[in-house]
Amino acid sequence: MSEVETPTAASPTFPVETSHRLDTLHTSSTEQIIKDSENVVHTTLKLPTSTLSREFWMKDERTNNCSLCETEFTLFRRKHHCRICGKIICKYCLKEAPGFIFRLQGSIKVCRPCASILVNNYSRSQLFNHSLNESKNRDLTEQHPFVTLDELNSNDQVLSSFGDLSSTFEMPNNIHPPEVAPMIAIPSSRSNYDSPGWAHHSIFLDWSKRNLDSNVINVEDSESGKYNALTITNSYDAGPSSVSTDYRPVNFGKVPSYSKLRKNKAFSSAKVSDMYLSADERNRLEDFSKGDRGLSFVNLSPNIKATSYDRLSTVINEPFISRSSSLTDERGLADSGNSYHHFSDSDDESLFNDGLGLSFHANSAIIKQRQQNVASIQRYGNESYLSNFLKAFLPKTVCDYLFPSSTIPDGLPALIENFNARVDKVNHPGGTEEPLPYQGKSRASSVVTSSKSTCILPPWILFSDSFNQLVCTFLGKLLFQMLNDEGVDSPMQWVLCLPKILLKMALDLGPDIRSGDDIDVRSYVKIKKIPGGSIQDCFLVNGVLFSKKASSKSMDRSLRRPRIALLTFSLDYACDEQRILSLDLIISQQEEYIINLVNRICMLKPNLVFAQGQIPSIALKYFEEHGVIAFHGLKESVLYDIARCCRADIISSIDKLSLCPRLGTCGRFQLRTYVVDENKGLRKTFAILDRCSERLGCTIVLRGADYNQLSKVKKIVELVVLIAYHIKLECALLRDKFVNMPELFETTYQSLSRKSLPSFASTAADKEKSQNHEKKSLNSDNQSLRPLENENQSVSSTQGSNSPLELINNLPASDDYSSITKALKTRFLTFSPFLSKPLPRLLNQVNYYQFIRNKLLKDVKLHPYSPTGSFVMKQSENDNVEESYEESYKFFCIDERYHFLEKQWTLYYSHSKLMFSPFSSQRIILLYSIINKETSVPCIGPERCLLEFYRETDCTLGQYIEDSCLNTNVSCGGEYCKTNDMLWHYRSYVHGNSRISVFLESFSCPVPGLEEKIIMWSYCKFCKKNTHITVMSEETWKYSFGKYLEFMFYNSQIRDRFEFCDHSVMAQHVHYFGYCNMALRFQRDLIEIFELFVPSVTLRNNPSYIKELKEKEYKRLKGVIEKCLSSVASRINQIKCDWVTDPEKFESCTSEISKFRTLLSSDYTELYSEFDSIYLNSSTSDYLSLNSILRVLQGKMVKWEQRFLDYQRLYLPSYKELSKIAAAQIKKVFLERPLSQTPLDLPETLENTQIDIYPSFKTESTDDQLEKVTQTNVASNKRVAPYADSMANVGSPESDCFSVATSSDIPKANIDFTNDISTQNTFPASPVSNSGFSRQTYPNISQRQGVNMLSHKRKSASTSDRRFVNASSTSGMNMPISSSISAKISSIQNSTKYSPRKPIPAKDVRVSSLVRRFEELSLQLQEKQKRDEELIKARRKRALPVVPSKPVVEVFNDLNEAFDDENSEDENGINDTKENRATESNFSGVDSMSKERENVSSNEDNSPEAFEDIFGILFKNESGLEEQQNLEPSSQMDKEGSKLPTSGPLADKTSVYRILSAFWNEWNSLNPPPFEFPLQPTEHMFSDSNVIIREDEPSSLISFTLSSPDYLSKMVEIEDSMDEALTNQGLQGSTQFKIENLMLKPTGTHLKYQFEEGSARLSCKVFFAEQFSALRRACGCEETFVTSLARCSLWESSGGKSGSAFLKTFDKKYILKVLSRLESDSLLNFAPAYFDYISKVFFHELPTALTKIFGFYRVDIRNPTTGTICKTDIMIMENVFYDECPSRIFDLKGSMRNRHVESTGKVDEVLLDENLVELIYESPIFVSEQLKSLLHSCLWNDTLFLSKLNIMDYSLIVGIDYTKKELYVGIIDFIRTYTWDKKLESWVKEKGLVGRGPEPTIVTPKQYKNRFRKAMDCYILASQDFETGEGFKFCE
């Protein structure tokens, strides 16, 4: 991770901040200083040895002792004089200083104090820098032996280049098409979380202030006009050793190569002229470059380098210097007459511009050069060249106005006359008016209309009227608004006075930023408050004004063009105060020292001396004698202002007097006295240095109020000064962008005129007091301000009654969105009249949700809808109730989101007090990054950066472009980047909903000669065309880079003036800047801002889900009713009276059947009527009440079963009777059959006969099942048993009976039919199933199957059990039979005989062998009968009536006891037999249920003979059969069977198969299929609850337990005891207070509930019952919690790596996670702290992203009948994505090790960290700054809480919905603690014993917390919105 560098500004030249800065202003090499001093007027100091003249030495007779050590001089101790101060010292106090400082060989003698001064002023490197400079210059000269003036000017070459512009240049359409900027991405290996995010070093440039170095330039060659000629530093004149590296914004400390430096303007102007040119050439260059450019709207970039391009600029601009005075009151100014011969008497304010001591009119060299320039232009000025040249750089409107026809006047003078004539008409269309600053007050817009003048007017003048009008109107309204906000009296008078002053100031001021001036113009504008007078007395001073009394009353109070000396050293005589000295000696020495010092100063011939320290009175006396006015005790800042405005050197030490310091000057000096308090008569004197260069600085004087009022005005004016200057630069930018400026000015002015003046009103009394006076002054003021009159009246009239806003200290309420929105739309908040900021995104959202919420409340009749979604109204009350429910739910969702956003807005609003003020618009916050073009991975950032406009964190647009283009090979700063060059990277700035990408590209300048100038053009992305090329003007070069980005982000209305394009210039164009054969591309793209959702405090129920569930349940239960009653109808229809022989019974049987049909019809009507009534009268959310119909249905089915049992007993023969008949027939067959027949032929014959006789009743599924039977049979006899089963199943056709069963969607029971039902590994003997009855008929059966897999021991058995269920319904006695099969019983006997098998030789065999074979068949039938008995028992269970639950409850107060009480039982319970379980059972419901079973069983034939099989009857009385009970193995039987003789078929006898088949068919006709009951063997229902317990849905047991009456009563008891305890403590609170106390209980109650239903044992243990109940009540989900848990299904989410089993409730509201033993222990230990933390979330609004846990339970289900054994720990938590459909889901841990899965595109697929990183490479995820702050706060709080509990391995689940642009987040899996195994693994890996990966796999909780925070902060990025003063701060 790259360290973030905080930029620190280099030591600035201005302003001076420390006491040593004034000294450091002279830290330059003496050699260069002496060279520069040749052009300065020399003093009359006698310097024969270039040191202090002996005239200023102290006389030898003055002292006989050393001035420093007081050592007496002797013959051997000589006197020495300091060559700097002139004191007499001894050799021990003597130091030698390098002589080259004073341009001497060797060294000079100085005293120790002077030597220390030299050391302080000149560092060691600077003392010896002259030698380095000489060698460097020598090297440069060797590289470039000759650089002549002709080469530098190269007029012909440049002019010929411009000659190529004969036609307007247009960029080709295919040149540099704007590619789509790749989106920023997050590096997978690191993040910049530790970055402070403010003012990153790679954004900003250090151009404004730099450290001084030896390579200085002369002020005569500089554009800045700065006060110190010895210390001017240029931006590019430094070599590699002098470039500042402590503040490296773009170049990262790298220096461009010399070849590029040489191309730079400032370098070529300063260094080349000094190093390579002769004195004459330098003078010529200086004379040429001294013109005042002013504010020019031609696209000519000024340059000291004397090209013809610059000459034209000089010609265009110089003649427009007007003779105008400043706004200073001149009545108190008088000429002093102290003028010098080289100064003109002209009052021209441009007299001292640009460092010149001469007037332009007196400079013959300039005039001569100007004539040469005009001649050169005329020489090249043919008609086509001149017109096309101007067309290339002037706006089209200007060119059309200048050249109305194709005929261009010959020569420049004619063109100028035409130009001036037209301009004169523009400026004075209807007569004469008082000119505005642009109409004669400013040199930039002044017009010399003399016919003798040959000039070209700058295009700016063409719209000076509209510009002045626009700016004055905008500034006036802005001032009026801000003055009202501050409560300033008489705001309208200020509005009428200040705009003109501010406009003139902005137009005149022009800091030279290239030479080191600050880009903040406020550094050079001082605002002085002088109480008293009137507001109209405010004035502007083009110089400095400061408060200072005169040192002497006799001194002059006014001077013209004084010479000014600035001193910062002390004039006092310094002596050792700790020594005892003679007072007379000290006085004499002091006097002589001061006299000499004053004489030395006066030799410079100053008129004014300003000293920082105190001046001794004797010195003041001598100054007065010399006619010098001296001021002392000046502030350092005042000296700085004087030095800059008057261009004077600050003399910081005595030695500087020997270096010919430069004295400053001004046009006029005066002392003026003002009355500041009329009541007290207080007066104050001010010194005024006026008529200095306008470009260097000025002072605005405020008058007309008291000090407090003026302080408020000063604060406002300081900002408006910057705004006025910014508007000037912005207009230049728009002009360079080819915007139609006159049209823009007109439309903007009209918009401003229509805009009202809302303000934070003052009191009505104040307005009424000042209104009369303001109206009087309106008539005489400027017309541009008159529209403010009506607005002022309207504002004043409304402020007294219903002002839209209060005072600024009484802002509108945070929920008054309409007022806030109106104020933000109507108030002036930006620096520009062309720009309006959008409303804060958060305000738009909360306003929108409030509107929708109110609309729903008004237009929709809502149902009562609690936060949990419990609908109270019944469905029968409203026809459109479903639609109303949906509207209610929609309202709840909107209301919930509205309140959430409202809280965020309130917090945001509280930190945004300056939202309604322009003071909030002084900065912009960006998300900044440097991104690799190829990989899209950011090398720097993304990080939040602050840009303060026109401050040190900002730079100019020109600086940014030049530095970027000159530093293409600079490293990007990325730690892992392989291509470090910035040419392969781009910068990205994200703000609001946009992103600006800045690309650096290679580019060949299309116009030769413009490579060294910044050219501009743009490309429309929609029109696919380029605009014309233009050269960047100087004003555009100074435009703020931060404001340029803001302009691109916010402006979308301004269009260019080209006909082919009507799109927004700033928003929809790609902007190009070319410089040095490089192009910088600015491209704006829109980004998607996602809405962020954290887990809500309250849960909700979507009525559509509830409605869907209820509808499904209604249809399912209706099908159950239909199926059960259909089974009764089928039984009734199959009843026959054929076996009834008694006529009396026959009639009663017929009447009984008729009665059955009547009762069935009555049951149909009753059940459906009751069911529909339950459905209609229950609430929409209550679908469990529908289960109550099952209890009614179950009772009716029990009655029907009893009726048919009675019917069978009365009218039908028993099984025993039928068996006797069949046995008699079989005996007859065997007695008549010959013994030669092989017994083994019987099964084969039966099998073959089955296939032949019943082909139509064999389905494919039946064949498959039969095949499975032969493969999986586990009976002892592996050959005979299949035959027996086949014979038993032959007569079981399936066509009619399953026509009803196929409509069922209820699964069959999991029944084990083996002998030992307690054994798990059991297999069915005959698993024949019906193909029509499949699991597919029940939609959720597959999900419920998965639940059984929760128990690892039941995984294999569960699958087999399901096969048992289907087999049980289709085998043996329970197989239904159709009437067609019954009809065939008689026909079977008469069917054709079977074909005989191939004859086998007959053998003798005994009758006993034959009997043994039949006995084997009998054994198989007995086994089948046992299985049928088991099924009958299961069926009997279903026939039992529903009884109360009667649970056994155990209460635990000790957590460990509650958690471990079942360990011993768990170990042994699985192997218990059914009998042991029944013996150990202590359930109270056992006796009652046993009695019920006995009652039911008593009605059946349960005697030993009741089920005696046919073979028992057949061989019952035969003797000798007992000996055959021990069967032989099948292999042995095969051997014996092979010996049996075979014979032919029995043609005469009836086969045994026919007899048996007829027997089974008859029996099945007498015993039709069993009834269908509403409950399955795996379903359990009790009479005291509507919840059905399902063995494959563990949540149903939890739901049943929580809804049991006993549990509810215990919760009431706990709450009552809590209330009683609080009452005893004297604490009474609301319901929330009680809930909070329940959650904070130190101990919890743990309950264990045990139920028994039939053979099933059900147990549920509830942990922390009252705490979780209170938590659910706080969330508002307690009422619906039971309903949601009633049904669940297996939830399989692919992609995740947790390996845990999950269940999801049918309503998708809750997730159930199956916990391991270790996780359960962690959860129970973690629970108390969790309740404490979550209570702060509910009741103290603590931000959190933790998903809520609603309960922890242990479920134990054991049912031997179905083979179910399920014991598991279940944690119930909320579903983060409830009612949402995220497109992608991510499980994020902040690690990149093994955090990648292959995406399959499945629903609910969970992806990991690396998948997210791959995604955000292409499409980063942005949220608003406020929501990102919320997420940051949530993650900070949650991770801190979890780390304190030693918890780790938690994840942030993130769902992204690209359709709705929403982001859902929540922390899950936060129950894993840092256990000893993790610690050991971490220690081993830290020691390097195993694993050598890039990052540790096991970390501590603290490390995990930090890594998690950093990663999440990097995954989700924030886009800063509307910045309001203080901004939105992180809530950490």
UniProtKB/Swiss-Prot annotation:
Catalytic activity from the UniProt record:
a 1,2-diacyl-sn-glycero-3-phospho-(1D-myo-inositol-3-phosphate) + ATP = a 1,2-diacyl-sn-glycero-3-phospho-(1D-myo-inositol-3,5-bisphosphate) + ADP + H(+)
Starting at the broadest rank, the lineage of the source organism is:
Eukaryota, Fungi, Dikarya, Ascomycota, Taphrinomycotina
The record's comment about this protein's domains reads: The chaperone-containing TCP1 (CCT) domain is essential for the interaction with the scaffold protein vac14/SPBC25H2.03. The conserved cysteine-rich (CCR) domain contacts intramolecularly the C-terminus, including the kinase domain, and this interaction negatively regulates PI(3) 5-kinase activity.
Which residue intervals define the domain PIPK in the entry?
Answer: 1590-1916
Q: Which residues bind Zn(2+) 1?
A: C66, C69, C90, C93
The yes or no answer to whether the keyword Ribosomal protein is present is: no
Stretches of Basic and acidic residues bias are at 765-778
- Region called Disordered, residue ranges: 763-804, 1346-1371, 1457-1504, 1522-1544
Region described as CCT domain: spans on this chain = 457-721
The record's top EC class is: transferase
On subunit structure and binding partners, the annotation says: Component of the PI(3,5)P2 regulatory complex, at least composed of fab1, fig4/SPAC1093.03 and vac14/SPBC25H2.03. Vac14 nucleates the assembly of the complex and serves as a scaffold.
Query: Which residues fall in a compositionally biased region of kind Polar residues?
Result: 779-804, 1522-1532
| Zn finger limits (FYVE-type) | 60-119
**From the UniProt record, which GO molecular function terms apply?**
1-phosphatidylinositol-3-phosphate 5-kinase activity; ATP binding; phosphatidylinositol-3-phosphate binding; zinc ion binding
Put simply, this protein is called 1-phosphatidylinositol 3-phosphate 5-kinase fab1
Pfam families (alphabetical): Cpn60_TCP1, FYVE, PIP5K
